[in-house]
Design a protein with these regions (language model features):
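Gly/Pro-rich hinge or "lid" segments in bacterial periplasmic/extracellular proteins
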Residues: 176, 182-252, 256, 266
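Surface-exposed binding/hinge segments that line
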Residues: 126, 142-204
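Ligand/substrate-recognition segments at binding pockets and active sites
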Residues: 233-235, 379-454, 526
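Extracytoplasmic/peripheral linker and loop segments enriched in polar/acidic and small residues
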Residues: 370-372, 423-436, 464-531, 554
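Structural transition elements
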Residues: 345-384, 405-407
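Long beta-strand-rich cores associated with HINT superfamily self-processing modules
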Residues: 528-554
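Ligand-site clamp/hinge motif
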Residues: 244-288
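N-terminal lobe/hinge region of extracytoplasmic solute-binding protein
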Residues: 52-102, 221
Length: 554
């Protein structure tokens, strides 16, 4: 049944009215703008920065978000106890003064005088509510595990349903004082506090919004350098403006940020050359054309791309078949001929330049490599698998993002596997990133080309995800010896001896790779174009990839 545009418009206005009545006040002068509208830069205090992203923001809820793009936008509009400086070290943000006990188990934090974008003060209770919500099984946060990584008292037990959220080691002594208790000292605790999962949420505002929280501009509350002026799920344009009430507003020179979702590389560069973008990511085909341009930048990230395999699927539960797949595609060709963006081949789980050990050396220094391309060896594993499984042919579907680079890499891997492992057919299913992640988390897949970025500068950020039951353990691998080793390195005997812990982490990586839990592909580099009148963008390989607080555009 069809309705006229006029009737549809009236219905939309009525629905919007009810939405604003139920949960208003995202900003004091918030605007209900369409998701494709651009924002005219009328401010005299700075300029609008226009940034290309290659996927939609999946969530603006700090306790629900899981992907790098969502984290980047969240960090622009929300701030926690700490933030990252330009050199990647943790510095106080909402925290004004931090006292740490001698045993490293108690942090007493005095908060700055700050407020939300609706004028409400940011209080210690906002952190208590947010952190309890993070670990509450009812929230079903994919990042609930990170509270345990941070060592917060009782976090793991609450996540496992053995204790209640109000038993979490965080209390509000008063509106300005927060007391945090840990189970064990965590050397990277401060840097973890800059991660979006630990951002505050105002309980009263959250309760008014209900299940609409963080889904529209009027259901998002901001306390960061910028505030949201237009957003809705699957929006292709997201607009932010400078938050005049931000505690450090004097240092914010931009009038706002406009994120534009553009997945096609040719359209991206056309927009960049036309002046519609200030920051753009290049595809591999474009690197040679623009790498001599003074606006070209090459930046290494901590992201590891790999193929996840579902161990519940017949055949993929066979170690030899997984090894055959992993060794069958040419990683050097992927990074040198397809990506061309500074990415490096991955024969590992824990990336290079992530963390240094007690000896001052990078984790990869002196550490073995695994699952390197070897097409002859791949055939040997394939023959063993066929004998063990009693089959001569296999067919699997690989889930991938709809971003152009992911499609190019996937098509190359598809051709390599089908050529080098005769009788194996690989189909490709392309989905928006959000849907692809949902399928992976639900174990509703066979193979999936995916990535993981480091949340903090320690190998555990790549190792903890493979414990039994982890929401990020795509494909449901389980190994009780591995689980015990990781638990001891986190909070047991090994956690108290840095050298033994480091060796345990190397052993853990070896266990994952020897079992071919993943098929590693590459560590991501980024080839970007940045207009010459833009400076001060902070790039981080850990946590938030790009920070724009100190960016200027002349």
């Amino acid at each position: 049944m069809k309705m006229t545009r006029k009737i549809l418009a009236i219905i939309s206005i009525i629905a919007l009215t009810f939405s604003l009545t139920a949960c208003g006040g995202g900003t004091k002068d918030s605007k209900a703008e369409g998701n494709n509208e651009s924002v005219e830069d009328t401010s005299t205090s700075g300029s609008l920065l226009k940034v290309q992203i290659d996927a939609e923001v999946a969530s603006m809820d700090p306790q629900i978000a899981t992907d790098g793009i969502s984290f980047e936008v969240l960090a622009a509009v929300t701030e926690g106890l700490y933030s990252l400086s330009d050199d990647g070290s943790a510095v106080e943000a909402i925290a004004d003064k931090v006292e740490k006990s001698e045993d490293g188990l108690t942090y007493t934090v005095t908060l700055k005088d700050t407020k939300w974008s609706n004028g409400t003060p940011v209080t210690a209770k906002d952190f208590v509510f947010a952190w309890r919500r993070l670990v509450d099984p009812a929230t079903a946060s994919e990042y609930s595990f990170i509270a345990g990584i941070a060592g917060i008292k009782n976090a793991d037990a609450i996540v496992n349903g053995e204790m209640t959220p109000d038993q979490l080691g965080i209390t509000a002594k008063d509106d300005k004082t927060l007391v945090i208790e840990l189970d064990t000292p965590v050397p990277f605790f401060e840097s973890l506090m800059a991660f979006p999962s630990f951002f505050p949420v105002n309980e009263e505002f959250y309760n008014k919004c209900g299940d609409k929280f963080a889904t529209t501009v009027d259901t998002i509350l901001c306390n960061g350098a910028f505030k949201v002026t237009s957003y809705e799920p699957a929006a292709t344009t997201i607009n932010l403006e400078k938050n005049a009430d931000y505690w450090d507003a004097d240092k914010v020179k931009l009038s706002g940020i406009q994120y534009q979702v553009i997945k096609d590389s040719q359209q991206t560069m056309l927009s960049y050359q036309n002046g519609d973008l200030d920051v753009a990511t290049l595809s591999g085909e474009q690197v040679e054309q623009f790498q001599a341009d003074p606006e070209f930048k090459n930046i290494m990230s901590g992201y590891l791309w790999y193929i996840a395999s579902n161990k519940k699927v017949a055949g993929l539960d066979n170690e030899n078949l997984r090894k055959a797949i992993s060794l069958s595609y040419d990683k050097e060709a992927i990074v040198n001929n397809i990506l061309k963006d500074g990415s490096i081949k991955a024969d590992f789980l824990v990336p290079t330049l992530l963390a240094t050990g007690p000896d001052g050396k990078d984790f990869r220094d002196g550490t073995d490599t695994y699952l390197s391309t070897d097409k002859a060896k791949a055939l040997e594993y394939y023959d063993k698998a066929k004998t063990e499984l009693g089959k001569d042919s296999f067919e699997y579907t690989m889930l991938i993002d709809d971003a152009e680079s992911a499609q190019n890499v996937a098509q190359f891997i598809q051709a390599e596997i089908q050529t080098n492992l005769p009788g194996m057919k690989i189909n490709i299913e392309t989905l928006p990133k959000k849907n692809r992640l949902e399928r992976l988390r639900a174990d509703d897949f066979e193979l999936g080309l995916t990535r993981w970025g480091p949340d903090y500068a320690d190998p555990m950020t790549y190792l903890d995800m493979w414990i039994t039951g982890s929401p990020n353990n795509y494909g449901a691998w389980s190994n009780t010896e591995y689980d015990s080793l990781i638990q001891s390195a986190k909070k047991g005997e090994l956690a108290l001896d840095s050298e033994k812990r480091w060796e345990a982490l190397k052993k853990a990586e070896k266990m994952v790779m020897d079992d071919a839990v993943i098929c590693p592909v590459y560590q991501q580099g980024n080839a970007v174009m940045i207009k010459k009148n833009v400076s001060g963008i902070e790039f981080h390989s850990v946590g938030i990839n790009r920070v724009y607080k100190n960016t200027t555009k002349n």
